[in-house]
């Protein structure tokens, strides 16, 4: 009976070793599960981006409004009868120099 128990104990130890440290172990399982989760979230982001691009392509193919908007933003399109205003941001040096000139007067 004692040799039988020793064989069962050795078999149990071997199976436990393979479960925790061997090929296809639990650590590999959890690592793969984590990688799959990250990959699925990345895929979801890319699918969303693809949908936005598909909608933009469809809009550019079917309508002139999107094409005109893109030409205005990227190429500076101005139609006849429109007035173009360029808003220049405040430069801190020009503000200080104008304040100093007002102080001198």
From Swiss-Prot:
Keyword Zinc-finger: no
Residue spans, topological domain Periplasmic: 22-105
Stretches in topological domain Cytoplasmic: 1-3
Coiled coil: 38-75
CC per GO annotation: cell division site; cell septum; plasma membrane
Membrane topology: Single-pass type II membrane protein
Record keywords, A-Z: Cell cycle, Cell division, Cell inner membrane, Cell membrane, Coiled coil, Membrane, Transmembrane, Transmembrane helix
Subcellular location(s) per record: Cell inner membrane
Main location: membrane
NCBIfam families referenced in this protein's UniProt entry, alphabetically: PRK00888.1
UniProt xrefs under PANTHER family: CELL DIVISION PROTEIN FTSB
Function as written in the Swiss-Prot or TrEMBL entry: Essential cell division protein. May link together the upstream cell division proteins, which are predominantly cytoplasmic, with the downstream cell division proteins, which are predominantly periplasmic.
Protein name: Cell division protein FtsB
Organism lineage: Bacteria, Pseudomonadati, Pseudomonadota, Gammaproteobacteria, Alteromonadales
């Amino acid at each position: 009976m004692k040799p039988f128990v020793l064989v069962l104990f050795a078999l149990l130890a071997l199976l436990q070793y393979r479960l925790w440290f061997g090929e296809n172990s639990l650590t590999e399982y959890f690592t793969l599960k984590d990688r799959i989760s990250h990959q699925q979230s990345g895929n979801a982001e890319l699918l969303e981006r693809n949908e936005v691009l598909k909608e933009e392509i469809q809009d550019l193919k079917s309508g002139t409004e999107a094409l005109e908007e893109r030409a205005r933003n990227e190429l500076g399109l101005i139609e006849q009868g429109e007035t173009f205003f360029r808003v220049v941001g405040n430069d801190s040096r020009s503000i200080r120099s104008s304040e100093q000139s007002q102080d001198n007067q």
